[in-house]
Amino acid sequence: MKFAIESISKNSGRLGQLRIRDGGPEFKTPLLLQTTKGGSIPWLSADVFETHVSRKPQVLQFTLSTMEQMTEALTHWNSGGGRGLSDYVGLPGHLNILLLRDPCETTPSGGNDRDILPLFTRRGKESLSSERYMEIVASFKPDMYEGLCDADTNLESAKKRVQKSVDRTEKFMQYIYEHRGKVNSTLLAPIVGGYNTFARTQSIKHAREQPAGSYGGYIFEGFHANGLSATTLDTSKLLPIVEHCVKQLEEDKPKILPGAYTPLTVLELIQQGIDVFDTSYAYCASLNFKALSFSFVQDAVEHVPFLDITDEAIKEDFTPPLSNCNCLTCQKHTRAYLHHLYKTNELLGPILLMVHNLYHYMAFFEKIRESVAKDTLPQLTELVRNQNGKTQVDYSIAANTKVISKATMGKGFAAAAV
């Protein structure tokens, strides 16, 4: 993996080029990973995504917690050589990264053991040792993979729990550093330690003590329990820790921060030097019946962050979900129709909502890269913060409570929300 910085500024973060595989496509950073569940982009087939969201190569974010059951099948799939993880899930032509936990769902706390990491899968809790993890990575053959780490910390974690997360991660990673040569994939060094600067420094020190070339980048873990909790983080606590960490890390390695961070938090993290994020925020919005409507283009109109499609007020509103959006949903359908799909639990509802939210969020990142290049990220941040209003906009996502009936499971929104 190769990472080159194109430009860097004090106010706007940095613009870079990331080449994950020799001969593969280059990706501009700040980069947006495509979050998947069970190897698929939620609600969207490969054809729908590539036709109506983006035709460009993407980096798919796979998670072991949703794909662990595929290990045996992938061992046979890859035994012939030449085929990869993206081909297996029906998304050839895209690169991928393998993470441990699903950023879209809350990860249960507890279950930690001395030499074992709990992995919460669709089949329940699995015990994951360093040896077993490397066997799985060898079966999956991802382009990049996250090092095994204890990320069971958040703002409320006690000092003892934070220290244990660092110590256990060091033990896991020591084995992985020693055996990484058996896997032809780029390792990402995990940086853990909750909100404790001393613990974060210890985690960074252990990674930087490794021989040159041991890993290709850094991934920050342990700030939240994933799911909607990432949308409500107190940035006054988060940003100083991120700044503390980034100052101690090399500039020539990409820094990844998975999770459903709000658009405003993403902009503030980019200013701190974070390079890679994911689309779990777009998924969480879709799951909770929200169409992203925040503006990132300067105008004189006051905007709101979401359109709530459960709102009865839009049942006779025949305007597009977002008037200036060029996605399939906004070009062909109306707010009233989305509301109708919600009320009837039609499968087309979450499909159209996800198409819009991904399209909008990816356009947002295009604007971010343009702003970083022009050193105008502070102006974009201010627009996103207030949306031309007088107060800061709330981008947090609350869990939906308007599920119609469990009897409708397997159809549309209800299948995911129940």
Swiss-Prot record:
One of its GO terms (molecular function) is tRNA-guanosine(34) queuine transglycosylase activity. Heterodimer of a catalytic subunit and an accessory subunit. The keyword tRNA processing applies. GO terms for biological process: tRNA-guanine transglycosylation. Its cofactor is Zn(2+). This is Queuine tRNA-ribosyltransferase accessory subunit 2. Keywords: Cytoplasm, Metal-binding, tRNA processing, Zinc. InterPro entries: QTRTD1 (IPR028592), Queuine_tRNA-ribosyltrfase (IPR050852), TGT-like_sf (IPR036511), tRNA_ribo_trans-like (IPR002616). It is found in: Cytoplasm. Zn(2+) binds at residues 325, 327, 330, 356. The keyword Zinc applies. PANTHER family: QUEUINE TRNA-RIBOSYLTRANSFERASE ACCESSORY SUBUNIT 2 (PTHR46064:SF1). Belongs to the queuine tRNA-ribosyltransferase family. QTRT2 subfamily. GO terms for cellular component: cytoplasmic side of mitochondrial outer membrane; tRNA-guanine transglycosylase complex. Pfam families: TGT. Coiled coil: none annotated. Binds 1 zinc ion per subunit. It comes from the Eukaryota. Non-catalytic subunit of the queuine tRNA-ribosyltransferase (TGT) that catalyzes the base-exchange of a guanine (G) residue with queuine (Q) at position 34 (anticodon wobble position) in tRNAs with GU(N) anticodons (tRNA-Asp, -Asn, -His and -Tyr), resulting in the hypermodified nucleoside queuosine (7-(((4,5-cis-dihydroxy-2-cyclopenten-1-yl)amino)methyl)-7-deazaguanosine).
